[in-house]
Structures are given as structure tokens and as C-alpha cells.
Amino acid sequence: MLATGGQPYYPFALLLTLYAAGCVPVARWAAGHARRIAVLVAALAVSVAVSILASLPMLPVRSVPAAITAVNSTDGDSIGWPAYVAQVARAYQALPAADRAVAVLVTGNYGEAGALARYDPGYGLPAVYSGHNELYRFGPPPDSARVAVVVSMRDIGTSGWFAECATVGRLDNGVGVDNEEQGDPICVCRNPRRPWHELWPSFQHYD
């Protein structure tokens, strides 16, 4: 699974078979022994509590400790999306009107692309494109797009794909949670050196 680029949690459903196999000997071990049953119940209670805190969004975002995001990065990665979209929107809205008319958004991953699509209403953002995983197959921006607001592509400024790129901001979730997007650049890139349909294969990446 990992060799093909899958996430490490994809095969976790197989753990159910191990739990099922373990239930019989545990039940035999605890049967008729009040102290063993008490130990088992206490262990289960601790396991459930830790699992809830590590897996579900139960804590206020400002209280999420680094230990939890280290165990389950998904917790940290679920924080800050509305703020990130607002910051990208400000970068787009700061463009001159002529640039906004020929602008697109390009993101480094599907999470950013999804957030921009989800929270776009009210901002009037242009179309979103990404070369990440299967989003690449939706195709490139039109060749008429001369300006790109590029999110979370750290090497875009040195790629040579555009005549100019400038970092105009950095993503900040506002609560100090160090997740995958925190601190990533928001860049404005102008004048692609080649048509988008020729550049697009360079944007493709799987992870």
C-alpha cells in the first residue's frame, strides 16, 4: 500500500480481524475473575479516551497539542481552511482588474483545491486547478490565463515556468497549529513561458 503511494491508514480495517481473533482468549482470561474484568474495563476506558482525543475533533483548535498532531496529522490538517481561503482570496482581490480577468488559482494539493471550492462563495474566486493526484486529469488552465495565484508550491519561483513569480503572503491558520499548510507561500506568477497545456505535465505529482 505504501509502495503505491497509499496512505498508511488505508489497510487499518484489517485490524478488525485481529480484534475479533483476540476477543475469545481475552473473554476466557477474564471470565469469572472480577479483578481481571475491572482491569479490562479500565484499559478499554483509557483506550477509548485516548482514541477520541487523537482521532476526533473534540478539543478547541487553540488547545490541540503537538503530541496529538504528531500521532494523527489529520487532526492538524483539518484546522485553518476558512482562514487559508480568506488569505488566498485577499491575494487574488489585490490584483489589478486586468490581471484578475485572466487569473486562475493553482494549488499544490487536493486539500487546498477542495477548500477553495468549498469556501469560495462570497469571494468570487476564479477556477481552481491542481496537478495533485487525480485532479491532474481535470486538465490545465486555459492558455488565455496569464496570471496564476499559486498556493503551497514552494519551488514555483525557481521552476522557470513563468516570466515572474512573487511571494505575496504565507498561509497562517491563526492558532499556531503546525500542519501541512502552515507557512506555505501564496505566490502570484505571471506570463507562463509556454502554453498551459504544455506546462501541465510538469505540475503532475502523486503523494
Residue ranges of predicted features:
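Membrane interfacial helix motifs at helix-loop boundaries and amphipathic/re-entrant anchors
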Residues: 2-14, 56-76
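Hydrophobic/aromatic-rich transmembrane helices and adjacent perimembrane loops
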Residues: 4-35, 39-40
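Signature aromatic-anchored transmembrane alpha helix within multi-pass, membrane-resident enzymes
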Residues: 27-64
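Short, glycine/serine-rich, charged loops/turns that create anion-binding
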Residues: 46-49, 110, 155
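Short periplasmic/luminal acceptor-recognition loop of GT-C membrane glycosyltransferases, typified by
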Residues: 61-136
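Aromatic/acidic, Gly/Pro-rich catalytic loop(s) in extracytoplasmic/lumenal soluble domains
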Residues: 87-89, 96, 128-207
